[in-house]
Amino acid sequence: MNLFLAGLDHTTAPVEIREQLAFSQTDLPSALMQLTSSETGTPPLFAEAVILSTCNRVELYGVTNPGTTAQHVVDFLAAFHRRPAASFVHTLYFYQGEAVARHLCATAAGLRSLVLGEAQIQGQVRNAYEAAQRIGSVGSILHRLFQIALVAGKRVRHETTIGKGAASVSQAGVELARRRLGDLRGREVLLIGGGEVSELAAQNLIANGADRLTIVNRTSARAAALAERYGAEMLDFGALPQALARADIVISSTAAPVPIIYRHHVAEAIAHKQRARACGECDPPTMLLIDLAVPRDIAADVAQIPGVHLFTVDDLREVVSHTIELRSAVLEIAQQIVEEQVQEFLSWMRTQEALPVLTMLRQRAEEVRNEELARALRRLHDLSPEQRAVIEGLSRSIVNKLLHLPTRCLREAAAHGQGKRYASILAELFNLEH
């Protein structure tokens, strides 16, 4: 079995492709089950699997079964999402072994994010791991890998300043609006969505002077809670057309699988604004729409409407590109931390080479102990239960003490890349089948 990763991100695939391969929360159970189980009697692709799907990446982490190839994973993606492989295969990257660990640790640390050092990715990595754990697709290898990657993310944020003042996608979206429109005071701002992205956007909008904020979400309770925290107006989702009609800025970040705003919605909103101005010959009103969702919330052809400016997460590069330069001084330290965590994982992986021999050694020792204990007890008569327990405890203690040193030595040798050599020697010395 081998550690394997297939994925695409904001550096290899535009949002038009990322949204086609994104996995929703409702998709994950089915996808993970398909990857790790088989109804045909043939081995599944993965013995273990985790899917990380965010607005900027879709990545499949797995421990492959013998015979699994990259093409098998491509075929799975094509079949699951009902997309021709030719439409996305050129955007995929594939890693194996050590490179998988390095990629995940760097990802959890925010070093592969569109916004360098952003903190949200660590929670997204944790959520992906926990979702797979609930499904039962996480085994010992991915458990260890994701725990070490999360430590890498935590260490980078605590031991470097790379995350100090780091923008989030939400903050970048607000900054884009500020750059395009200037002062946000008096602007009608519509937030669509009730999750973390919307909450961060609300925080940053208020910090940048926005004072006329409306929140719309399918779940009214979440929208109401956000509105109360940030002094915003809350509207039911059914009032979205009316909210659009008065909005100057729209920031949308729902988890909807298809767009929730189409061209006719925005065209009607612009027409309403035009009528309200009572100026038929004036330039069309402007509306700034920032779509932070993947899959996208706003249909692409909305951008064709005069006066409408539509931006997606891919357009945020112009806002955040400077963060790489600003944080390059601490980037090297962060990469060193990532490498330390990678080496810790690799050391643990090497110790796994020793487990089969150690298991056989322990089993052989138990066989001998049980045989000799039974022989001794047959020769001793009239022992009380307490006396028998003492003798049995003595036999266990002797075995444990005798095995402690070779066990420790083999584990240490394995951690330093000598596991196979020492395991072979131990197997020969104790006549173990290896």
Swiss-Prot record:
Possesses an unusual extended V-shaped dimeric structure with each monomer consisting of three distinct domains arranged along a curved 'spinal' alpha-helix. The N-terminal catalytic domain specifically recognizes the glutamate moiety of the substrate. The second domain is the NADPH-binding domain, and the third C-terminal domain is responsible for dimerization. The record marks H103 as: Important for activity. Its EC number is 1.2.1.70. Signal peptide: none annotated. The active site is at C55. NADP(+) binds at G193, G194, G195, E196, V197, S198. During catalysis, the active site Cys acts as a nucleophile attacking the alpha-carbonyl group of tRNA-bound glutamate with the formation of a thioester intermediate between enzyme and glutamate, and the concomitant release of tRNA(Glu). The thioester intermediate is finally reduced by direct hydride transfer from NADPH, to form the product GSA. GO terms for molecular function: glutamyl-tRNA reductase activity; NADP binding. It catalyses: (S)-4-amino-5-oxopentanoate + tRNA(Glu) + NADP(+) = L-glutamyl-tRNA(Glu) + NADPH + H(+). The lineage of its organism: Bacteria, Bacillati, Chloroflexota, Chloroflexia, Chloroflexales. Homodimer. This is Glutamyl-tRNA reductase. Belongs to the glutamyl-tRNA reductase family. One of its GO terms (biological process) is chlorophyll biosynthetic process. Substrate binds at T54, C55, N56, R57, S113, E118, A119, Q120, Q124. It comes from the Bacteria. The gene is hemA. Keywords: Chlorophyll biosynthesis, NADP, Oxidoreductase, Porphyrin biosynthesis. Catalyzes the NADPH-dependent reduction of glutamyl-tRNA(Glu) to glutamate 1-semialdehyde (GSA). Pfam families: GlutR_dimer, GlutR_N, Shikimate_DH. Pathway: Porphyrin-containing compound metabolism; protoporphyrin-IX biosynthesis; 5-aminolevulinate from L-glutamyl-tRNA(Glu): step 1/2; Porphyrin-containing compound metabolism; chlorophyll biosynthesis.
